[in-house]
Curated annotation (Swiss-Prot):
Residues 1-120, 533-556 are annotated as: Disordered. It comes from the Eukaryota. Residues 39-51, 59-75, 106-117 have a biased composition (Acidic residues). Its main location: nucleus. Residues 1-11 have a biased composition (Basic residues). Keywords: Nucleus, Repeat, Ribosome biogenesis, rRNA processing, WD repeat. This is Ribosome biogenesis protein ERB1. Component of the NOP7 complex, composed of ERB1, NOP7 and YTM1. The complex is held together by ERB1, which interacts with NOP7 via its N-terminal domain and with YTM1 via a high-affinity interaction between the seven-bladed beta-propeller domains of the 2 proteins. The NOP7 complex associates with the 66S pre-ribosome.
């Protein structure tokens, strides 16, 4: 270490150790650093009491204490350090004499006579903890009493390199002007202790201002984390505040000046008229030419340069796949879209509340009066960035497009011309009914057609001529909702329903004597049974009320051919006969337990097969060859075995409201018409779900019917005023499904009060069908 000339003039020996120690203790900078004396207990970890001798020798016991006091190695280290403090200290002072003492020995005689106080040094010389020269400067009395720095600075040397203090025992000065001593370093042992027990806030760095380990607080660590994440350091700070419209934010109502407009703004300008006349006069005189012909240049003067003249076409790389193009924008992306593309408040709120992944569109259509009023697109940068990501991150695959005819993918259906005969034209119109015609039925012989309507009449017409041959009024208040011929040919019986009454009619004026007598015998056979009388209970309780009351309607009706009257508990809407003609079922949708009733003609007996029916009954149908009974509610169709009296199957058409059903003559297929405009085909052997769903009508379907004469035809009637004729081929092979082909749409009925075709029925042998409309007419289609 080099010593300047002023330091060579020191005339004394090394300064007393006691004074140096007192100054260090007075500064209070070594609190917690120095070790305890040997007389104190080893378990005491308090750093407040320090030993002066340890200060002189520069050794520290606390630096070598370990948290595990019971270990043998830690105990040996402590003993060795104490031996160094006691015995080794004197030897170290003898062997390692400070350099300033050797330099100053020869100068004692020269400086003894000098008594000038100005030449006395302002420091004392001693040794530090490592045996090196240590200069202890006197305290500096600060002149000022305040500090103008923002942060509290431990070291106040300023912005200078700390290498200037490498030759000094201190590293700077604190706020009071006192020296900040260089802390002692226990290099190996401190590193071991730090690796064992890492203090809170430890960074492993050294503070260049103080020389001590640099520890960071939780707040400082949080600031560093935010900086590394490119986040705002201060909580609650908004780097992008909303712009406050100071000048245009407030809309003024009153004008700045309310002075009336001057007259000169409403009359032509005379000065402008003079200027225009000068220009017109110059044009007329030829001095001004409105159109100046371009000068003709020779071909040699026109020189054109082809920049790509020497350019050679470069073929694309074999693995090059061009980027897919973006789809063109639609009407909703226009700055002035049509009104139907603009969302309302509810749609806008739903769009804002939905997640970005769930939104159908990435933007909300907005309307602007002019293109200059369109602001900047907010998500333009984001869209370009995502497009760039898609271009270089998404893999591209070259797919060979297959040129396939779409019609080849459709099932091969037969040509409708090959499926004839089926009805195509209207052959006859039956007029004479007042109000709506609600029901229609063709007799088993195919000669007569029966109909009923809102006027309460049952009318019978000739099928070929359309002439009305018989009628009878059943009710003055109720409409005739259902008519159905008995399906056998030996007797001609017509069942009609009006309100809560069901009438069995024999139109004897239209029948031969033999058919008339057989028809009367069928109806009179049940009078011998006392089925209409209430039954008496065995225990003497009150007799049970019969669900149906069979009686004669009266002489007036009997003269017209109405022979039997059945009274039930609720209005009847549907009548369907069993194939043998001895039973028929009625459906009353308003009834609960009496909604479905089965009537026996030969016994004049009415039975209620269901004590409790799930849902509201809509219609019922007998199986054409088995003892199975189908009951349709609004949403389901249940099939019951009447012989075993058990439920066979539940069909789930998936419709909201079933209107009508019909069973195929083979018995394995059912068609269902619904009020939600669908026609459903059910295969009973396939599934309880529909095999086919046909949507060809714009309004509700009222009735569906299969042809019962062996032709593969079925039809439906809708409120849109049309009938759909279909070809339905069913084979006995279970491996082949039914073939359904739409054939013809028949239009002719007018729609009245949103009601079109109410009912239809097929001819028993021919491909003819009869339809009943809300316009008060019947139509024959062949």
């Amino acid at each position: 270490m080099s010593v300047n000339s002023r330091k060579r003039k020191v005339a004394t020996k090394a300064a007393p150790v006691q004074s140096s120690s007192d100054e260090e203790l007075a500064d209070g900078l070594l609190d917690g650093i120095l070790s305890h004396s040997e007389d104190e207990s080893e378990d005491d970890q308090d750093a407040e009491d320090t030993d002066a001798s340890s200060v002189i020798e520069g050794l520290s016991d606390e630096d070598f204490e370990d948290e595990e006091d019971s270990g043998d190695e830690a105990e040996e280290i402590r003993k060795q350090m104490r031996n160094l403090n006691t015995s080794g200290g004197s030897q170290q002072r003898k062997t390692r004499q400070p350099a300033h003492e050797r330099l100053d020995d020869g100068a004692d005689g020269e400086l003894e006579g000098e008594e000038d106080e100005s030449l006395k040094p302002n420091y004392t010389v001693t040794t530090d903890a490592h045996g090196q020269v240590r200069y202890l400067y006197k305290e500096i009395d600060p002149v000022y009493e305040s500090d103008d720095s923002d942060a509290e600075a431990t070291n106040t040397i300023g912005n200078i390199p700390l290498t200037y203090y490498d030759e000094y025992p201190h590293i700077g000065y604190d706020i009071n002007g006192k020296k900040i001593m260089r802390p002692a370093k226990g290099e190996a042992l401190d590193a071991l202790l730090d690796s064992i027990d890492i203090p809170k806030g430890w960074t492993g760095l050294t503070d260049p201002q103080t020389g001590k380990p640099l520890n960071l607080s939780e707040e400082e660590l949080d600031v560093l984390k935010r900086l590394t994440r490119n986040e705002v350091v201060e909580d609650g700070y908004d780097p992008y505040p909303e712009m406050v419209a100071y000048f245009s934010g407030k809309q003024e109502i009153m004008p700045l000046s309310a002075a009336p407009e001057p007259k000169r703004r409403f009359i032509p300008s005379k000065h402008e008229a003079k200027r225009v006349m000068k220009i017109v006069k110059a044009i007329r005189e030829g001095r001004i030419k409105p159109y100046k012909a371009p000068e003709e240049r020779e071909e040699d003067e026109q020189i054109s340069y082809d920049v790509w003249a020497d350019e050679k076409p470069r073929p694309e790389h074999s693995m090059h796949i061009p980027a897919p193009k973006l789809p063109p924008p639609g009407y909703e992306a226009s700055y002035h879209p049509p009104p139907e593309y603009l969302p309302d408040k509810a749609e806008e709120e739903a769009w804002l509340q939905a997640d970005e992944e769930d939104r159908e569109k990435d933007f909300l259509p907005k309307n602007y009066e002019a293109l200059r009023k369109v602001p900047g697109y907010e998500t333009f940068v984001k869209e370009r960035f995502e497009r760039s990501l898609d271009l270089y991150l998404a893999p591209r695959v070259r797919r060979n497009r297959l040129n396939i005819d779409p019609e080849s993918l459709l099932p091969k259906l037969p040509d409708p011309e090959d499926l004839k005969p089926f009805p195509t034209t209207c052959a006859a119109i039956f007029r004479g009914q007042e109000g709506r015609v609600r029901c229609v039925s063709v007799d088993p012989q195919g000669i007569f057609v029966a109909s009923g309507g809102d006027d309460g009449y049952v009318r019978i017409w000739e099928l070929l001529t359309g002439r009305q041959v018989w009628n009878a009024k059943l009710s003055d208040e109720e409409a005739v909702d259902a008519v159905q011929w008995r399906p056998t040919k030996d007797a001609s019986v017509l069942a009609a329903a009006s309100g809560e009454h069901v009438y069995l009619i024999v139109p004897f004026t239209l029948l031969s004597p033999d058919v008339e007598q057989s028809s009367r015998d069928v109806l009179d056979a049940g009078w011998g049974y006392a089925t209409s009388k209430p039954s008496t209970a065995a225990n003497g309780e009150a007799p049970k009320q019969s669900p149906g009351k069979w009686s004669r309607p009266g002489s007036r009706m009997e003269n017209k051919g109405i022979l039997v009257q059945i009274e039930v508990r609720s209005a009847v809407k549907i009548i369907n006969w069993h194939r043998r003609g001895d039973y028929f079922a009625t459906v009353s949708p308003r009834g609960q337990s009496t909604a479905v009733a089965i009537h026996t003609v030969s016994k004049h007996l009415t039975q209620l097969p269901f004590r409790r029916l799930k849902g509201i009954a809509q219609t019922a149908q007998f199986h054409p060859s088995k003892a199975i009974f189908f009951v349709a509610t609004r949403n389901t169709i249940r099939s019951y075995d009447l012989a075993k009296q058990e439920l066979v199957k539940i069909l789930q058409p998936g419709a909201k409201w079933i209107s009508s059903i019909d069973v195929h003559p083979g018995g394995d297929n059912i068609i269902v018409g619904t009020y939600d405009k669908r026609l459903l085909w059910h295969d009973l052997d396939l599934s309880n779900k529909p095999y086919k769903t046909l949507r060809f009508h714009k309004e509700a379907i009222r009735a569906v019917k299969f042809h019962q004469g062996g032709l593969p035809l079925f039809a439906d009637a809708s409120d849109d005023g049309s009938l759909q004729i279909f070809h339905g081929k069913v084979v006995d092979d279970l491996m082949e499904n039914a073939t359904i082909v739409p054939l013809k749409v028949l239009r002719g009925h007018k729609v009245k009060s949103r009601l079109g075709v109410m009912d239809l029925d097929w001819h028993p042998r021919e491909p003819w069908c009869v339809s009943a409309g809300a316009d008060g007419t019947l139509r024959l289609w062949n």
